[in-house]
């Protein structure tokens, strides 16, 4: 999930916290661990316009962490209501991210979530808290 977490970087995951919008989470998908940002919470409506702007329940979501505001591949029908017990996640590099916009990944269940990614510990020149 670039630009926040790059390939080969090592991060710390805090287990046991309920994900909130904007949190970066690690979750299991197809015997792999993916890192994405929580966008939609259970029961919310998520919509993405042709310019890549994200709306939650009709309100434009402020995403200062995004540099690549693109729709990317989207195989779900928008607007999309997040099912109970699941979270809608997007990668920060929207044009290439495999995330909840894909029916292959879909919304992430609470059981899939390892925890919140809070700290990058490798490489040493990029050590620090993630936002």
Name these PLM-found stretches.
Residues 2-131:
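Soluble "head" domains of membrane/secretory-pathway proteins
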